[in-house]
């Protein structure tokens, strides 16, 4: 078991050593940061086959998914950061009002210090390494905790980092006891991806030390479908987004709100596309994943025991396999609608009016993602305007996560904070405002003793100079 890979580490001592390394100033320079990022990139390239193999063992990820959603994603992220870092680190000049005569103003990005990154099991490589890249780029030291559920990927990451980076700079934690003890320590930032329950616990512990956090959570991300939906490419995107990684994606469409006028056609086209992707027996498909653990298999299987299954429904506990499954005539009080599915189930709820569908979404927590499949621009915008979600996509699925020029993150129950692209640098930095003034002269009226003339002059100057 991965929990046995490393002995219990003294959490306080580990954080102390990281803070000592940070305080040495080694992480401050552009040269150091680029050197470490390039080393990490080379390390990932050299271990691509091992990463792919670990993901296959943990989640039965196909080679395409391993590259497309994990390895390539991270490499492109590093490339973007390396190419942009010099610019990001430069002080940002801002306008200085005349009132601050002979002065200049800027914002400089200072590293925060010691960062704690906690990752989930569903994309165990990408969701750990991506925030680590941002923390490294910003000049921090990082203690990182991969999920023990994705045991093979966890072990590989531990080996890659421990053999190539100073433990006081980058450290992987695989021991559960140490993981919990670390949450009692003072960090300069905590970045967590996972479920709401654990995220809430981390938020409470962080608050004791006034530690800022990013919480990437999840929720039930809805998918709106109207009668103008493109049943060709748009349907392919939708089915791919739902069943990639066997549905174990935090931004996967969770349930589908489909106009009753096209519901029958939508279902038939969805079934057709599932068969096109995974064949008559998805269990034999090399492209369809497996549920991560027996516990999660039992949970997801229980969500559709009493549901109306119109396609799929097959399970095999020995392989932790659940077929791509479509559920029709789903009610809001059904088990599948009570929690985030995180599995290959596709509940369909028909609607007669768009406002009726929007009301369903508003009745729950704010989701991490929201999808609209329609060719009607007015419909698209109405849904976006009337709902609140972390992010949104129109006629696309999941792909917004890889658009590094867009912020990614939740709102309300689906999370706190955003990252990706420059935001990954910004969240692990303190944007320090600086005003510099010349000592050649100053406004004499600012200094005591004060009188009515000075007050009147100050008011006039403020109106003119500010």
Which residues are covered by each model-predicted region?
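ALDH superfamily catalytic-core signature
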Residues: 3-5, 165, 198-332, 394, ...
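Rossmann-like NAD(P) dinucleotide-binding subdomain of oxidoreductase/dehydrogenase enzymes
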Residues: 98-233
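Structural signal for hydrophobic packing residues in well-ordered secondary-structure cores
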Residues: 26, 41-44, 48, 59, ...
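Conserved C-terminal structural/oligomerization subdomain of aldehyde/semialdehyde dehydrogenase
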Residues: 2-5, 28-29, 275, 322-466
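Short, well-ordered beta-strand elements within core beta-sheets of diverse protein domains
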Residues: 20-26, 117, 223-225, 255-260, ...
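N-terminal Rossmann-like NAD(P)+-binding subdomain of aldehyde/semialdehyde dehydrogenases
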Residues: 1-106
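Residues at or immediately preceding the N-termini of alpha-helices
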Residues: 11, 30, 48, 179, ...
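Residue-level signal for inorganic ion chemistry
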Residues: 33, 78, 139, 170, ...
């Amino acid at each position: 078991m991965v929990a046995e890979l490393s002995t219990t580490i003294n959490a306080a001592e580990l954080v102390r050593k990281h803070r000592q390394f940070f305080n040495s100033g080694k992480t401050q320079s552009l040269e150091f940061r680029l050197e470490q990022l390039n080393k990490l990139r080379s390390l990932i390239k050299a271990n691509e086959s091992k990463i792919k193999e670990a993901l296959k063992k943990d989640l039965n990820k196909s080679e395409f998914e391993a590259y497309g959603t994990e390895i390539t994603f991270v490499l492109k992220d590093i490339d973007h950061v390396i190419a942009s870092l010099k610019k990001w680190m430069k002080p940002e000049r801002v306008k200085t009002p005349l009132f601050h005569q002979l002065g200049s103003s800027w914002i400089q990005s200072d590293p925060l210090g010691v960062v704690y990154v906690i990752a989930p099991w569903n994309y165990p490589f990408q969701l750990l390494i991506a925030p680590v890249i941002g923390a490294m780029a910003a000049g921090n030291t990082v203690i990182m905790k991969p999920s023990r559920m994705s045991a093979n990927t966890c072990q590989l990451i531990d080996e890659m980092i421990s053999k190539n980076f100073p433990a006081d700079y980058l450290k992987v934690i695989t021991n559960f006891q140490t993981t919990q003890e670390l949450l009692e320590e003072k960090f300069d930032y905590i970045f967590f991806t996972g479920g709401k329950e654990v995220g809430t616990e981390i938020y409470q512990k962080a608050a004791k030390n006034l530690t800022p956090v990013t919480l990437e959570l999840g929720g039930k991300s809805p998918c709106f479908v109207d009668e103008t939906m493109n049943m060709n490419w748009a349907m392919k995107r939708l089915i791919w987004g739902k069943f990639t990684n066997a549905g174990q994606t935090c931004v996967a469409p969770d349930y589908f709100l489909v106009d009753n006028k096209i519901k029958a056609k939508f279902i038939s086209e969805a079934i057709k596309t599932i068969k096109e992707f995974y064949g008559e027996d998805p269990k034999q498909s090399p492209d369809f994943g497996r549920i991560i653990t027996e516990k999660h298999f039992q949970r997801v299987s229980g969500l559709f025991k009493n549901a109306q299954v119109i396609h799929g429904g097959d399970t095999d506990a020995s392989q932790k396999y659940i077929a791509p499954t479509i559920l029709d005539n789903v009610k809001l009080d059904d088990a599948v609608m009570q929690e985030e599915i995180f599995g290959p189930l596709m509940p369909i709820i028909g609607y007669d009016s768009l406002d009726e569908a929007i009301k369903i979404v508003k009745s729950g927590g704010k989701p991490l993602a929201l999808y609209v499949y329609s060719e009607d621009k007015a419909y698209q915008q109405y849904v976006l305007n009337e709902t609140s979600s972390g992010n949104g996509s129109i006629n696309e699925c999941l792909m917004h996560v890889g658009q590094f020029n867009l912020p990614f993150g939740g709102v309300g129950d689906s999370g706190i904070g955003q990252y990706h692209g420059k935001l990954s640098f910004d969240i692990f930095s303190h944007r320090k405002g600086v005003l510099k003034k010349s000592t050649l002269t100053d406004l004499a009226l600012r200094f005591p003793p004060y009188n009515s003339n000075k007050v009147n002059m100050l008011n006039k100057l403020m109106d003119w100079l500010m």
